[in-house]
């Protein structure tokens, strides 16, 4: 029997699990500190999405409106438990974030991609905006456009 994956909005009760997942999955310099995660849950509940099975957090995606362009979301984190990588969870979370962007009428989702993830984000519908410096190495500024927003314009 297969256990279904649920995509839900993050809540304050998820904070300890989110912190534990990022501690196991990210280098220390890329981890968000507790009060920033808590503030993100409070301010960005619509765009802080979790992938869960029955009783375990498997991954999350965090995006919020860009301060200088509030019609666009900026994706800050996409974190998947190491035991569940390469099973489509990241793609599932990105699809859920795109769905939220459409529902909330965001024009686009932007992200910064390191070289090694460029093809992954391209596979998920993001295009390279421009080559940029990212985390002291070459990286890419990528964007996904809301197709429904483009149709209306």
Name what the model sees in each region.
Residues 4-18:
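A short beta-loop-alpha structural element at the N-terminal edge
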Residues 26-53, 62:
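Active-site rim helix/loop that mediates acceptor-substrate recognition in acyltransferases
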Residues 49, 114-115, 124, 134-153:
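C-terminal "cap" of GNAT-fold acetyltransferases
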Residues 50, 56-65, 72-74, 79:
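Conserved beta-strand in the GNAT
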Residues 65-76, 85, 135-138:
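A conserved beta-turn-beta hairpin within the catalytic core of GNAT-like acetyltransferases
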Residues 80, 86-99:
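Conserved acetyl-CoA-binding loop-helix of GNAT-fold acetyltransferases
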Residues 101-113:
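Conserved GNAT acetyl-CoA-binding A-motif
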């Amino acid at each position: 029997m297969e256990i279904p994956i649920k995509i839900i909005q993050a809540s304050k009760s998820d904070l300890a699990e989110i912190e534990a997942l990022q501690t196991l999955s990210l280098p220390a310099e890329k981890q968000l500190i507790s009060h920033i995660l808590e503030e993100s849950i409070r301010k960005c509940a619509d765009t802080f999405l979790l992938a869960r099975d029955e009783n375990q957090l498997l991954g999350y995606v965090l995006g919020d409106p860009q301060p200088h362009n509030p019609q666009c979301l900026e994706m800050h984190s996409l974190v998947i438990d190491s035991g569940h990588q390469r099973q489509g969870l990241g793609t599932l979370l990105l699809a859920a974030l795109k769905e939220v962007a459409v529902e909330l009428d965001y024009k686009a989702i932007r992200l910064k991609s390191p070289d090694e993830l460029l093809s992954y984000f391209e596979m998920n519908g993001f295009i390279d905006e421009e080559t940029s410096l990212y985390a002291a190495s070459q990286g890419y500024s990528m964007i996904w456009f809301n197709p429904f927003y483009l149709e209306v314009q």
